[in-house]
């Protein structure tokens, strides 16, 4: 977001535009620099003065108003992916309020800058609905002893010590946030805080699902419970504890992290609680952890399949489990309803399922479901529910 090169002589770049009697840029013009950057804007006797916009070689841009050659006031930096940083500048340096947005226009950061470094109370927003709130340190990092991770319900929190945004130790709290998302005016008011358990960053490995497998997630515990499924031969299922709206995160899907090649090369009987996380990594809940007597840190693996689901899988950046999947509603769900997702095993032309792409129980259900169902519905399921 550099706004330098404030004095521009004609021989410093390829300049096109109005000039003064001394052959300096004066009025509207455009300069192409040897770096590949380009500036279009207003000049006064060789100095940027007035509205202007940098077009950088990496396809990002920076626009705003220039005073005596320096960006002053609101400047808008647009990355090549469409994400935006809207900041206050003083003499070319970020100084004051700043906002950041993802390519879809959702806010991802709000806070303050001093001499180009983040300072004071800052708010970090994640696309899954969670957020981090706290005072950054002198380096602008979210490293302190009073940081709050806020769950999507904006009342359940984990408050404690964080290092560069990673949770070190934290306790469950009930909080009140003043102001809508993106417009909060202060650190959350803590209504109550539990003395235990203490939560820590606990990202799984290929061999360890959790160092504390019997410590449940406080947010998930308020929304769901496991009980025998109403679906025949499905074992346990997951049920809603209360009425919830569409697009509500209900449960988290943590597990050991395996390579996709390993998962794809083993028998389907070993993949009953396995889900893809990325193109390379899958999450798996091994058989010994299926029972809540042995593992209840997350319950997303309890959600069963349906061709008419009320939920879908989504990604989630969890303060304890790291990057995982979650279960999110696709319509309103009532208290006592069983949560279901579409497992999205690959299939083609109506009732025909690729033999190598789905377990037998799924192929049997698909044959039943496929009767009198338009082929295009089946073909589009993966796009609708994954």
UniProtKB/Swiss-Prot annotation:
Main location: nucleus
UniProt-annotated binding residues for S-adenosyl-L-methionine: 234-236, 304-305
InterPro entries linked: Hist-Lys_N-MeTrfase_SETD7, MORN, SET_dom, SET_dom_sf, SETD7_N, SETD7_SET
Region (Disordered), start-end ranges: 1-21
Compositionally biased residues, Acidic residues: 1-12
The UniProt record lists the keyword Zinc-finger: no
Record EC number: 2.1.1.364
Gene Ontology terms: biological process: heterochromatin organization; peptidyl-lysine dimethylation; peptidyl-lysine monomethylation; regulation of DNA-templated transcription
SET domain residues: 222-344
MORN repeats by residue range: 15-38, 39-61, 62-84, 109-131
Record Pfam families: MORN, SET, SET7_N
Key words, A-Z: Activator, Chromatin regulator, Chromosome, Methyltransferase, Nucleus, Repeat, S-adenosyl-L-methionine, Transcription, Transcription regulation, Transferase
CC annotations in GO: chromosome; nucleus
Family annotation (Gene3D superfamilies): Histone H3 K4-specific methyltransferase SET7/9 N-terminal domain, SET domain
GO molecular function: chromatin binding; histone H3K4 monomethyltransferase activity; histone methyltransferase activity; protein-lysine N-methyltransferase activity
Subcellular localization(s) per the UniProt record: Nucleus; Chromosome
Reaction catalyzed: L-lysyl(4)-[histone H3] + S-adenosyl-L-methionine = N(6)-methyl-L-lysyl(4)-[histone H3] + S-adenosyl-L-homocysteine + H(+); L-lysyl-[protein] + S-adenosyl-L-methionine = N(6)-methyl-L-lysyl-[protein] + S-adenosyl-L-homocysteine + H(+)
Function summary: Histone methyltransferase that specifically monomethylates 'Lys-4' of histone H3. H3 'Lys-4' methylation represents a specific tag for epigenetic transcriptional activation. Plays a central role in the transcriptional activation of genes. Also has methyltransferase activity toward non-histone proteins.
The family this protein is said to belong to: Belongs to the class V-like SAM-binding methyltransferase superfamily. Histone-lysine methyltransferase family. SET7 subfamily.
UniProt name for this protein: Histone-lysine N-methyltransferase SETD7
């Amino acid at each position: 977001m550099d706004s330098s090169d404030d004095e521009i002589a004609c021989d410093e770049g390829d300049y096109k535009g109005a000039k003064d009697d001394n052959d300096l840029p004066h009025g509207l013009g455009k300069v192409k620099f040897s770096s590949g950057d380009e500036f279009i804007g207003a000049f006064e006797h060789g100095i940027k003065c007035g509205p202007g916009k940098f077009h950088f070689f990496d396809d990002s841009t920076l626009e705003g108003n220039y005073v005596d050659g320096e960006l002053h006031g609101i400047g808008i930096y647009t990355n090549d992916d469409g994400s935006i940083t809207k900041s206050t500048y003083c003499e070319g340096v970020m100084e004051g309020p700043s906002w950041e947005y993802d390519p879809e226009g959702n806010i991802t950061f709000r806070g303050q800058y001093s001499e180009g470094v983040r300072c004071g109370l800052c708010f970090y927003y994640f696309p899954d609905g969670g957020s981090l709130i706290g005072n950054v340190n002198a380096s602008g990092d979210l490293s302190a002893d009073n940081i709050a991770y806020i769950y999507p319900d904006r009342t359940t929190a984990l408050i404690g010590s964080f290092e560069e945004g990673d949770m070190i130790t934290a306790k469950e709290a009930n909080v009140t946030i003043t102001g809508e998302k993106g417009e909060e005016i202060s650190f959350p008011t803590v209504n109550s805080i539990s003395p235990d358990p203490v939560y820590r960053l606990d990202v799984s490995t290929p061999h360890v699902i959790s160092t504390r497998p019997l410590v449940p997630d406080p947010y998930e515990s308020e929304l769901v419970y496991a009980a025998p499924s109403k679906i025949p031969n499905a074992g346990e299922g997951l049920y809603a504890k209360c009425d919830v709206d569409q697009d509500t995160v209900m449960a988290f899907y943590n597990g050991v992290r395996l390579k996709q090649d390993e998962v794809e090369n083993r028998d389907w009987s070993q993949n009953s609680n396995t889900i893809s996380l990325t193109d390379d990594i899958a999450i798996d809940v091994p058989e010994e952890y299926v029972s809540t007597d042995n593992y209840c840190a997350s319950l997303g693996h309890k959600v069963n399949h349906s061709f008419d689901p009320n939920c879908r899988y989504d990604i989630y950046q969890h303060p304890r489990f790291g990057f995982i999947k979650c279960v999110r509603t696709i319509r309103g769900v009532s208290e006592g309803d069983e949560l279901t997702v579409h497992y999205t095993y690959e299939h083609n032309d109506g009732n025909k399922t690729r033999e190598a792409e789905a377990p037998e129980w799924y192929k049997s259900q698909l044959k039943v479901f496929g009767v009198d169902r338009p082929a295009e519905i089946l073909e589009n399921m993966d796009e609708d529910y994954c």
